[in-house]
Swiss-Prot record:
The chain crosses the membrane at residues 6-26, 42-62, 92-112, 127-147, 186-206, 236-256, 258-278. InterPro entries: 7TM_GPCR_serpentine_rcpt_Srd, Nematode_rcpt-like_delta. It is found in: Membrane. It comes from Caenorhabditis elegans. GO terms for cellular component: membrane. Keywords: Membrane, Transmembrane, Transmembrane helix. It comes from the Eukaryota. This is Serpentine receptor class delta-7.
């Protein structure tokens, strides 16, 4: 009989390795190929790519599923973190979750930055760096609280035999939480689901406000800068759909509470490995300097684009 775990392990491995490569490449472009008009913003982009790399590396090390029973959650790891024991696997899991929440906060900061540039002026690099640190605080609290969480690994393994006696989990690393209403797992759950939902709403509100400002009032920048800002907005508009992908994971999480099924248990993590692959692709497609660099790599010359002042309206209206 086919073991479904091999399918999900393969999906996880391919997507996380692909995500590492794509994000490292975009990080290189953001550092060395960003035009002056978006060089300050590239600081946020660099942080996003490095956060995505962290999510991909930890995801590759985990290869995890979640088994739920009442107030308890069991995390079963199939990845290389198992070589260093349960404690290491759990800390990797804590890092994995905090990378994803921080990436969402950085996405929110991206929209705040674009709106601020339109209504005032571009902030200094120092202000932007401080902003990145501030939005990291909620995810840092989540990481520290989870790493300091105490757990009895023998008790968790015994619980797994009671909850899912039909599963053969011999030799696998089992961590988790006996009561997710304790501070660390509950804070993580609220941060991943409720606060992330509010961030997603804020992102879509900001996107609409940015479009209204640019279309109705115009932007006091040069023609070339207007085009670059419009391209960035197309990128951010694509990224605004990213939080929706996370909620497929929430759906599988809820289904996993109702039915004990390995497909639901593995599928909780599939959306979280898809997101770091999709988010950088938008920059390759919509930001002309990056797109031209990639086109030149593969075709020997960039695609010719006509830049003019009227192209901004159709670009931001999609």
């Amino acid at each position: 009989m086919f073991d479904i775990s091999f399918l999900f392990i393969g999906i996880n491995s391919i997507l996380t390795l692909l995500g590492c490569f794509i994000n490292l490449f975009l990080c290189y472009l953001a550092i060395f190929q960003s035009p002056k008009a978006i060089r300050t913003y590239s600081l946020v982009l660099i942080n996003i790519t490095l956060t995505n790399v962290g999510a991909c590396v930890t995801g590759f090390l985990l290869d995890q599923r979640i088994i739920q029973s009442g107030k308890s959650m069991l995390y079963v790891s199939y990845g290389y973190c198992s070589l260093l024991g349960e404690g290491f696997c759990f800390n990797i899991f804590a890092a994995y979750l905090h990378f994803h929440t921080h990436a969402l906060w950085l996405l929110f900061l991206s929209f705040v930055y674009r709106y601020y540039v339109i209504i005032r002026q571009e902030p200094t690099k120092k202000v932007l760096q401080i902003s990145v640190v501030i939005v990291y605080i909620p995810s840092l609290i989540q990481l520290i609280s989870m790493c300091l969480q105490e757990m009895n690994f023998d008790e968790l393994r015994s619980l797994s035999k009671e909850v899912v006696p039909q599963y053969n989990l011999t030799g696998l690393t089992i961590t988790g939480s006996l009561d997710f209403f304790t501070f660390a797992p509950f804070y993580c759950l609220v941060h991943m689901a409720i606060i992330s939902f509010l961030i997603a709403i804020g992102i879509h509100i900001l996107r609409k406000m940015i479009i209204n400002r640019m279309v109705l009032n115009g932007v006091d920048v040069t023609i070339r800068s207007r085009n670059l800002h419009a391209q960035l907005l197309r990128t951010l508009s694509f990224k605004a759909t990213v939080p929706i992908i996370y909620y497929f994971g929430c759906i599988f999480f809820i289904l996993g509470r109702i039915w004990i099924n390995p497909i639901f248990e593995f599928s909780i993590f599939v959306p979280t490995v898809i997101v770091p692959v999709l988010t950088p692709l938008s920059a390759f497609i919509h930001v002309a300097p990056y797109r031209d660099f990639v086109s030149k790599m593969f075709h020997g010359r960039p695609k010719n684009k006509t830049v003019n002042s009227i192209c901004i309206i159709p670009i931001i209206s999609h």
